Design a protein with these regions (language model features):
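Conserved, compact domain cores that house catalytic/ligand-binding motifs in diverse enzymes
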Residues: 178-270, 275
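Extended active-site neighborhood of metal-dependent phosphoesterases/phosphodiesterases
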Residues: 147-174, 195, 199-201, 242-338, ...
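Acidic, histidine-bearing metal-coordination/catalytic regions of metal-dependent phosphoesterases
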Residues: 11, 22-199, 445, 455-467
């Protein structure tokens, strides 16, 4: 007998309040700009932020010299990415010189039992305010990782002249009844005008602070999360790879990669419209099953991976070539015939409800991507772009399938989620008229994140406001 499957959504938004003692800490505040559809953060007036800015971002030594994050703008930090399966893991980081990169991994914190894995280095020329990076380093480790196990790792830019990094930890989780974290549009640098490229750059500093706070709360809410899903626009600067453009983009990546959680939990991203024209995205991440280059723009391509009984597929929706996207989807689905659930992530919210995009480019892209979701029986599609939360009804061939009590049993069609803003760098107002396909929508002008629980029988999605 075929098992029944349920798709369950718990609440459109559940408020999370963080307290230092017994009193709530209000981290975010917003003010409307001259753009009638857009709201930007006013975090620079919040005391928690000013303390962090003075003691971390603009930290000074005894001689008054800047030594903090805003001085280094370190976009070389290592990022973990999911491997092809739960037994695999990807690593990516920048270095000042090109060498032969490697990662060593063991179960003992002193790495006395470590195995060494060599990778590849690609020559680049990426500068921010402080550094010029000459290599993008990637290492892929396959078949090593067991469930519910803590591993320790260190990495070097060059095994021939090794200077190993400090030891970091990575704890695997179970692959049945597992949980992920979903975020949308961190868009570091978007809280005002384009980045100014100094230690006092309000936009990058503010968005880094808020992005880190959201991830910290997400980890508290979902301590057993296996990895993070980010639905695009990790950074803000949308220009091409001009010298100035690369400078600003790498400074924004310094903010995006700042949270320590990204050294401990794999991150699966998709390419947003703000990343699509530059090449830095493909240098910062080591995405699995991307070697065919299907769905490519300058920034990178489609890719996929499996975790437990779920197939995850990331499509580059900046590329409108449905032939290539179909080829990737076909390869992914045929390679994972036992997947109980199929989840696609791309940036543009084809069933969103934000004022700027849902009835313009979102509607146009719907004609391209929605038929692919129907064709391959995709259960859930995760998107961003409109900086407001939206959940569709189950959609099949453009028709909204109603369901009661936020639970669908043996559902037909695809559920579409627009993730909102994880950093609160900016928000878009909701469309004046609620579209026919929208089951729930929200713009509380507070950053959001979601947890997604997967089992053989169900997917449960909970979305939180973080204040």
């Amino acid at each position: 007998m075929k098992k029944m499957k349920a798709l369950q959504i718990i609440a459109a938004a559940m408020a999370v309040t963080v307290a230092a003692t017994s009193a709530p800490v209000n981290v975010f505040a917003y003010g409307e700009t001259s753009a009638s559809s857009t709201l930007f953060t006013d975090t620079q007036n919040i005391s928690d932020y000013t303390t962090w800015k003075d003691t971390v971002w603009n930290k000074k030594d005894d001689q008054g010299n800047l030594t903090g994050e805003g001085e280094s703008y370190d976009s070389s930090r290592i990022i973990l990415t999911p491997g092809k399966t739960a037994k695999d893991l990807g690593f990516a980081w920048y270095s000042l010189e090109k060498g032969e990169p490697a990662v060593k991994i063991g179960k003992k914190e002193d790495l006395s039992d470590a195995q060494e894995f060599k990778g590849t280095a690609t020559e680049i020329n990426r500068s921010n305010q402080k550094n010029t990076y000459k290599a993008s380093n990637k290492v892929t480790v396959e078949g090593l990782f067991e469930e519910n196990t803590t591993y320790y790792y260190s990495y070097t830019d060059d095994v021939k002249n090794p200077a190993w990094s400090e030891v970091q930890s990575y704890t695997t989780k179970k692959t049945t009844n597992f949980q992920t974290i979903l975020v949308g549009d961190p868009q570091i640098g978007a809280s005002g005008s384009q980045g100014q490229g100094t230690a006092d750059d309000i936009n990058i500093a503010v968005d880094t602070f808020n992005w880190n706070k959201t991830l910290e709360q997400a980890k508290i809410t979902a301590p057993n999360a296996s990895f993070i899903l980010s639905a695009g626009d990790q950074i803000d600067y949308a220009g091409t790879d001009s010298s100035d453009g690369k400078n600003v983009r790498e400074s924004e990546y310094a903010g995006f990669t700042y949270p320590a959680l990204l050294r401990m939990l794999p991150l699966a991203t998709t390419i947003g419209n703000h990343e699509s024209k530059g090449t830095d995205y493909k240098y910062h991440y080591n995405n699995p099953n991307s070697e065919d280059g299907l769905g490519s723009t300058n920034s990178g391509s489609d890719y996929y991976f499996s975790y437990g009984n779920v197939l995850f597929i990331s499509l580059n929706s900046n590329n409108r070539n449905t032939v290539e996207h179909r080829e990737l989807l076909k390869k992914a689905v045929e390679s994972n015939p036992d997947a109980k659930w199929k989840v696609v992530m791309f940036h543009h919210d084809i069933y969103g409800s934000g004022q700027p995009h849902s009835d313009t480019d979102g509607a146009n892209l719907r004609a391209l991507f929605a038929p692919l979701m129907d064709e391959f029986g995709i259960d859930m599609c995760l998107t961003g772009h409109d900086h407001s939360y939206a959940r569709s009804y189950l959609m099949a061939d453009g028709t909204a399938i109603q369901y009661d009590d936020s639970v669908a049993i043996n559902p037909e069609g695809t559920l579409y989620i627009a993730a909102g803003s994880a950093s609160g760098s900016k928000f878009y107002k909701l469309a004046t008229t609620k579209q026919y396909y929208i089951a729930e929508r929200s713009n509380t002008q507070i950053p959001t994140f979601s947890t997604i629980d997967f089992s053989d029988e169900s997917i449960v999605i909970k979305t939180y406001d973080y204040n």
